[in-house]
């Protein structure tokens, strides 16, 4: 999931106040998000075409009281399982199984990214290998670092 540069955004609204601008919250790479808020009722609104899942504009009503959790349910186009990454000398190899969830979905891009930190994405990496013509099923990729 895109995790930097505001890749995935949600918007919080609290009615009853003069300022009706949204409070933008950003999802992290693992899909979590957080915000420091006053107690009270909020509307959590998904943005249009803003994620690697079936587009579904939604409003979730959340009553914030102390530490509050809410879940935003989505339908992914694909899921990935059986991930395995190995390093042999300078060769990083990755294998995974891609399962198609939405029948007419196409994989637009896939890549193997390497970083010196635990945080890695297409903007924060030291090496990358792009894949093209990707289909569901077992996928293998390697990169000489």
Language model features: what each stretch is:
Residues 31, 37-55:
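A short, solvent-exposed beta-strand micro-motif common in secreted/extracellular proteins
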Residues 15-30:
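Short, acidic Ser/Thr/Gly-rich low-complexity loop/linker segments typical of extracellular
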Residues 2-18, 105-111:
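Short, ordered, surface-exposed loop/turn motifs in non-cytosolic proteins
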Residues 31-35, 68-70, 137-143:
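Short strand-edge motifs at loop-to-beta-strand transitions and within beta-strands
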Residues 49-77:
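Structured interaction patches on ligand/partner-binding surfaces of diverse proteins
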Residues 20-22, 113-144:
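Recognizes extended acidic, P/S/T-rich segments that occur
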Residues 93-101:
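Short edge beta-strand/loop segments characteristic of extracellular beta-sandwich folds
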Residues 1-2, 31, 94:
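A short, amphipathic beta-strand motif
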């Amino acid at each position: 999931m895109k995790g930097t540069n505001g890749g995935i955004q949600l918007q919080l609204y609290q009615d009853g106040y003069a300022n009706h601008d949204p409070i933008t919250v950003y999802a992290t790479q693992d899909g979590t998000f957080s915000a420091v808020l006053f107690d009270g009722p909020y509307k959590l609104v998904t943005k249009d075409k803003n994620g690697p899942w079936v587009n579904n504009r939604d409003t979730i009503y959340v009553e914030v009281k102390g530490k509050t959790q809410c879940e935003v349910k989505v339908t992914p186009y694909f899921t990935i399982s059986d991930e395995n990454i190995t390093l042999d000398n300078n060769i990083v190899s990755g294998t995974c199984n891609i399962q198609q969830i939405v029948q007419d979905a196409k994989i637009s891009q896939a890549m193997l990214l390497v970083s010196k930190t635990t945080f890695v994405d297409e903007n924060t990496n030291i090496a990358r290998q792009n894949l093209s013509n990707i289909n569901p099923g077992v996928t293998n990729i390697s990169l000489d670092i």
